[in-house]
Amino acid sequence: MSQQTPQESEQTTAKEQDLDQESVLSNIDFNTDLNHNLNLSEYCISSDAGTEKMDSDEEKSLANLPELKYAPKLSSLVKQETLTESLKRPHEDEKEAIDEAKKMKVPGENEDESKEEEKSQELEEAIDSKEKSTDARDEQGDEGDNEEENNEEDNENENEHTAPPALVMPSPIEMEEQRMTALKEITDIEYKFAQLRQKLYDNQLVRLQTELQMCLEGSHPELQVYYSKIAAIRDYKLHRAYQRQKYELSCINTETIATRTFIHQDFHKKVTDLRARLLNRTTQTWYDINKERRDMDIVIPDVNYHVPIKLDNKTLSCITGYASAAQLCYPGEPVAEDLACESIEYRYRANPVDKLEVIVDRMRLNNEISDLEGLRKYFHSFPGAPELNPLRDSEINDDFHQWAQ
């Protein structure tokens, strides 16, 4: 092909710019129509913790799909990169950035924007020239690889010699077709992925529903283990509670028996003590009554030895002044045996016995005995009853003291 003049190249670039603008408008209109017609949110499912658990099983399920079984592998579609291709990538990235900047522009911009477009076109032409030079070098080095590559390189070399330095862009119809096909493939992939994810969610939901039904029926193994542990703990606590109750009841029974025994023994002790006191009191009363009855039965008392006690103005010694009156003893001083045997309650510090009265009593007794002996000796009989002696003052006082007690 013949080389183009600079004017023709400028005209072609202007036409391409117009086509690019039309393609951008068509893209915008198509995107708006697509957004109205297709609602991709219906195929999207919110991700959760379940999606993180997709492992080798999901990969196997993806591999088993009929659509992907006969699909070509990615490694067969992608050519192995060479050093030159890796060097091309930065330039291609710059080119794509410029194209995107172009597409984002809308007709009707000001002159500054047109100047910026011209500058971007110049940069693209420089990048294309660099890429073509690197492609030519790489194609010359890789001629011996295979026949197809050689043919492609020859075609590219011819195109390089014949093609103008201006950027060759595909037609808008082809771009629309490519975009439509790509969009259709992407939507198909998204739809299949959504179906797969929904299937996985359904399987997981079925498994969870099955476990829930097993839990409701009580046949879940983990739930059975948990119930068995709870039952074991409950039985242990019940056993301890029963043992504690049994021990407390035994303690209460022992305490009750001990209390009843104590009350019974105390009752018997009180009854025994009361019986003993009543018997002692009754016996003492009985002896007192009998003694008084015997005393009342005695009309003439027996002649007993009497120890006279010194009494002021009553006994013989005190009356005649033979001896002074006796003085009372202090509490705790001992009592003479002759007084104790006579049950004399008068206690004196000095000798309380009236010796003069004792002598007189002995003289009287001796006189009575001599008289009786004379009667027996001379008269051989008792002429009459003897004269009875009256009560002494000491005996009267003793009787008064007993009545006062």
From Swiss-Prot:
Q: Which organism is it from?
A: Saccharomyces cerevisiae (strain ATCC 204508 / S288c) (Baker's yeast)
Q: Which gene encodes it?
A: DEP1
Q: Name one GO cellular component term.
A: Rpd3L complex
| Keyword Ion transport among UniProt keywords | no
Keywords of the record? Chromatin regulator, Cytoplasm, Nucleus, Phosphoprotein, Repressor, Transcription, Transcription regulation
Modified residue annotations for Phosphoserine? 56, 120, 370
Q: Where does this chain mainly localize? A: cytoplasm
Specify residue ranges for compositional bias: Basic and acidic residues: 86-108, 116-139
Q: What is this protein called?
A: Transcriptional regulatory protein DEP1
Q: Where is this region: Disordered?
A: 1-26, 49-171
